Amino acid sequence: MSINVNISHREDFPLLRDSNIVYLDNAATSQKPDCVIEAVEEFYHKHNANPLRGFYELAMLATEQLENSRTTVKEFINAKFEEEVIFTKGTTESINLIANSYGMNFLGEGDEILISIMEHHCNILPWQFVASKTGAVLKYLECDMDGLISDTAIEEAITDKTKIVAITQLSNVLGRENPIARITKTAHEHGAIVVMDAAQSVVHVKIDVQALDVDFMAFSGHKIMSPMGIGILYGKKELLNKMPPFLRGGEMIESVTRTDAVFAQLPYKFEAGTDNASGAVGLMAAINYINSIGMEYMHERTLMLTKMCFDAICKIPHIHIIGAKDSNNHNGIISFTIDNVHPHDVSQILSESNVCVRAGHHCAQPLCDFLGFKSCTRASFMFYNTQEDIDTFIKSLSGIRKMMGYGD
Amino acid sequence: MSINVNISHREDFPLLRDSNIVYLDNAATSQKPDCVIEAVEEFYHKHNANPLRGFYELAMLATEQLENSRTTVKEFINAKFEEEVIFTKGTTESINLIANSYGMNFLGEGDEILISIMEHHCNILPWQFVASKTGAVLKYLECDMDGLISDTAIEEAITDKTKIVAITQLSNVLGRENPIARITKTAHEHGAIVVMDAAQSVVHVKIDVQALDVDFMAFSGHKIMSPMGIGILYGKKELLNKMPPFLRGGEMIESVTRTDAVFAQLPYKFEAGTDNASGAVGLMAAINYINSIGMEYMHERTLMLTKMCFDAICKIPHIHIIGAKDSNNHNGIISFTIDNVHPHDVSQILSESNVCVRAGHHCAQPLCDFLGFKSCTRASFMFYNTQEDIDTFIKSLSGIRKMMGYGD
Amino acid sequence: METSNFYNEILTEHNIRPYHKHDMPDATFSLNGVNPSCGDDITLKLKVVDDVIEDASFIGDGCAISQASADIMADMVIGRSKEEALRLAEMFIRMIKGSVTNEEIDELEEAGALKDISHMPARVKCAVLGWHTLQEIFEKNEDANT
Amino acid sequence: METSNFYNEILTEHNIRPYHKHDMPDATFSLNGVNPSCGDDITLKLKVVDDVIEDASFIGDGCAISQASADIMADMVIGRSKEEALRLAEMFIRMIKGSVTNEEIDELEEAGALKDISHMPARVKCAVLGWHTLQEIFEKNEDANT
Ligand SMILES: Cc1ncc(COP(=O)(O)O)c(C=O)c1O
Ligand SMILES: Cc1ncc(COP(=O)(O)O)c(C=O)c1O
């Protein structure tokens, strides 16, 4: 695929179009195109009602929108059944749901939970909690300094004691794609299930839950250009069917008595309360937008931008990129440190040139500890970034040590 | 206050303005005024970033919007401290949070949880769950056929064994306001805490958590004209401080190691994951809109519409209104049955005249059982409804039995 | 969706004056079918002799659609073989999903009066409750009966 | 918010060439202060004799703002009484919250170079870390020391 760097998609994004912001914090959250914002608006103008509840036309329209979104997501991730797609408020809720509903009920003393060292806090803390409550042991799958999880590491870490492997498809610090299919294969051989955090990958990698054979998968809409407050949990039907509900309330029941309740079928069993239908509609619009631009094209463009930026940073003295040496293993994410300049100061100085990057531990403290730093600065790209964005960023970045009073 | 029935607020609501829909399902979800839809749009146009995370200007704007919304909510419910206001996705999540974090950790064998017979499923199922896990006993506080919970009932039901009283301020079937202050007083005398479900009341009653002295309170934005996917949990600081987190992940930690985590301060301890900032902004706009119209005015207008409708229904044979005989005790909610016509058929026939009402058990099956029916039809009003809405509704309602083949 | 057309005479008649809504002491099969979320609840009773449905009735309650549909079904399956009844059930369910031919609708006789349900997703469960229960009776008892 | 003005010479000098960033074996007080979410981490050391701060130093690391602010503070409080130091702390924190007079900023000497933090909510914690730790030392030891 040949990418023309001069074609810009910035025009589709009102926040970028109407400002000179150089938005390089895409791994934290993405900007939203007009079509997504308008889809939400249209829902409130034409279809707003409590979905799944009413017999009148408006309520049926709202329900239809919600279910169309479910179908769109099903196709986007290639799930086998609609009812394997559950709406949540985001990755964090999705993973907490798995931990509380599956982890708390199917793990016991001596069982092992394996997570990678590069997990986001939301794929660590729920498992620490499950371990503390069930007596299961939490273990870590480590990578090398390039961020690579080797086959040997996988073979050694997964044993017959392993019951759950929870791992991100793409680290939000390193940007490297993990060998999920390889992990699933080994995990399944040992009778373990695999939970994949797709929060970062969903915008870069074409996800196929059946090909990867993961048992659960989670992502947030806001990182793929959809509105905030909506996310997805995918789970294999046979697993979801045997799990108890997590949140309890309306919509997830068949019948309720004073002492007891019969739960509804999938997916509703896991969707207690009023569904965020407008969020679902926004997510559907975002996926349609992605499909119209082309996932592969988006990714190629991101890789090209990543490479330009990577190569330029390599030329600036005193800056150290974290993770892989090959920019193609960074998938739009470049984290780095600058000698003797704290990332918070880096981020603030860049902000002066309207460059938005993130600084800190990126909700991945165990990884930072493991790699030997407390915090770092991260620039992250999406296909709508431009060469100009990178030029501005690099220019500002080059002057930081000087501005902080260092000779070079 | 004198209300002019001819003044219409319909113009503020695009869905109503641009259609001939008679929207009488306000208790399920409200319509959204332009100012709320536009506030969300403006957020995505001008302030969209991951809040609470970045050091750049855009992220600070997003954070500021989120925190301004928190302050607006704090004032709206008269909480004492900002950090007592926690963003959730809705009432259902809020109550599940309380049940899982407070209920599961501070209740034991023989303790009693008291809920009213008129609770919404989301204020029943979480307590059934807590009871089944902790050995606590779930008891019911009953009302009379008019929906009144008497002082005697309160005195008898709350004992020294009672640890939690969970009750709705306004039933979504009966519309009657419960004597919360009275309940709180008795509960506190016996050392119990009170959880108030304000999902229905928040749009009708001016809530003052300090005056009511409730320990926890929950509501959903979507029922007070704000976007879907955002809700509030209020809790007294001293209680929230001693509770463990519910959802676990980013933003709710101070530091994380491989084996352990130190949790953040309030309110962040309970806000794991990316906050729905656009939802919070929409909620702020909705509250500002309410303040500009005037809560008292809104309520007076709703009561007037309720009375008009109530009186008209009373004149139609074979229709039975559920609950209080005085329309002033209905706060915009009129549930009813029609002899020999099933509510689902009622709702569908009304839908033919563009009248949107809800039919079913309204997520309150124990109440339906208690009052002796399986399901009913509910018309619910907000201040933006009009006399015309009621005329259309009554006209269509009057013809239903005939249409179904009955002589009268 | 014209509701006033929808609640036609066939439907309202079967609803308020059902022919087959009564108990059947000598039934060979009896099965309860419910739509928990709607509250529709029927118990279908069949008297089957040599794979032929000699009599059919139901008791229970629910919305007009569920009741009328069950009554129409009872009417149609009486005197038919198990196979014919199941073929009609399959056809009816397909009609509700919106994929039948006009000839098939004709074959469904009075049950064809429910064809507009295909545009009312919320009412589908009501319309098919009786037919589903019929299918279930024969599926559950397949072994016992062959 | 002009960052380039903000990272002025006073700040960068105190950051890269701090006068008081060193251990103090004969300290009478030592307290660790952290901003867990930022990673800022200092240990403040004071040598207090008869309620007068004879020496002040710190060790640790963090962003330029936290380090420079701690260094400036150490500079300012040496030779002052406990009361005077606490008065400056209170004034500094007020400045960061945006409510001081020009005279007070003057009185804060080099610490006044941090006044623009009032427009940077995310950096407030960094700027006040040293001063908060100072306050804490005296609060914790109030009983012991009077
Ligand atoms: C009294 C009451 N409580 C709770 C809820 C649940 O609200 P949500 O579905 O927004 O969580 C509702 C509305 O459905 C309600 O009426
Ligand atoms: C890898 C990864 N997992 C999970 C999350 C959490 O997503 P959210 O905050 O939307 O729940 C993030 C983003 O913050 C992430 O980068």
Predicted region positions:
Chain C
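C-terminal binding/interaction regions
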Residues: 1-25, 82-146
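Structured beta-strand/loop patches that form or line metal/cofactor-binding pockets in enzymes
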Residues: 17-56, 60
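Secondary-structure capping and boundary motifs in well-ordered enzyme cores
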Residues: 38, 65, 119-123
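A generic structural motif
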Residues: 60, 78-79, 130
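Short, thiol/selenol-centered motifs that function as redox-active sites or metal-ligating centers
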Residues: 61-67
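Alpha-helical macromolecular-interaction surfaces
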Residues: 67-68, 87
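Alpha-helical support elements that line or immediately flank enzyme active sites
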Residues: 69-79
